[in-house]
Swiss-Prot record:
Component of the biogenesis of lysosome-related organelles complex-1 (BLOC-1) composed at least of blos-1, blos-2, blos-4, dsbn-1, glo-2, mutd-1 and snpn-1. GO terms for molecular function: gamma-tubulin binding. Residues 1-24 are annotated as: Disordered. This is Biogenesis of lysosome-related organelles complex 1 subunit 2. Belongs to the BLOC1S2 family. GO terms for cellular component: BLOC complex; BLOC-1 complex; BORC complex; gamma-tubulin complex.
Length: 132
């Protein structure tokens, strides 16, 4: 193994000369470089357009949320107004409920009295028929 290392270190291999590029190959390489450059340029332009679209969508969404916030604030204000009106009407609504309950009880009492009157009329009719 020492022999191999000695040979490798003592002699240097000849450096091959690089052949001059053939004009056709040079033209193909330049063409490829141009096409790759155009490809990357279009990729970058596409990415930039996508970012611009995302930015526009983001701004539109942000504006939509601002608009929705304004609408929600208006609805909340109107709801507060309606709640205040309801609170002002609550005593009257309680009176209406009380009158409704009284009316229901009067209707029940009327039904009982009508049954009683019907029974009395039937008894009176029976008594009159027996006396004849």
């Amino acid at each position: 193994m020492a022999e191999i290392n000695e040979r490798a270190s003592t002699s240097s291999p000849p450096v091959p000369s690089t052949p001059a590029p053939v004009p056709h190959i040079r033209q193909l390489a330049d063409n490829m470089t141009d096409k790759v450059g155009q490809f990357f340029q279009h990729q970058l332009e596409g990415s930039i357009e996508e970012y611009k679209l995302l930015e526009t969508m983001n701004n539109t969404t942000a504006q939509r949320y601002v608009d929705m916030k304004v609408v929600a604030e208006k609805v909340a204000g109107k709801l507060d107004n309606l709640n205040q009106k309801y609170e002002n009407l609550r005593p009257y609504l309680s009176q209406i409920d009380a009158m409704d309950e009284s009316t229901r009880r009067l209707e029940e009492a009327t039904a009982v009295l009508e049954n009683y009157v019907t029974q009395l009329e039937s008894k009176l009719t029976n008594i009159q028929q027996q006396s004849q």
